[in-house]
């Protein structure tokens, strides 16, 4: 596995542990529909959270959140629409971003709740 893929997997693993420690139930990881993917779908307090995970080894360059641009957000929303229909979801759905900076399983984690919403794009 390429180094950046290993870092991404370690970041997603750390994000899942973080979410579980905060009382979230993980419904799916890396859920795919056609060419779209949702990193993490979690549930807590009657809400579904679609969470995009961005991991970097350092913050010398672009901040991880900057990698979730308009085009990426549109793909996440389209994948979420498919997810909602496929699983017949009735609960409210929110879009979060978790950014991780670090390596070797040691990360600074930031959970940005309600990072974006559908109203901004339609």
What are these regions (language model features)?
Residues 1-29:
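Acidic-basic catalytic patches of nuclease active cores, encompassing PD-(D/E)XK
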Residues 12, 37-39, 52, 72, ...:
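Acidic active-site catalytic centers that drive phospho-/nucleotidyl reactions
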Residues 19, 38-61, 68, 76:
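Conserved catalytic cores of phosphodiester-cleaving nucleases, focusing on short active-site segments
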Residues 31-33, 55, 99:
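Short, glycine/acidic-enriched loop or turn micro-motifs at the edges of active sites
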Residues 33-36, 105:
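Short acidic/glycine-enriched loop/turn segments that link adjacent beta-strands
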Residues 61-92:
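Mid-chain, well-packed structural core segment of small domains
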Residues 86-122:
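Domain-level recognition of nuclease-like catalytic cores that cleave nucleotide substrates
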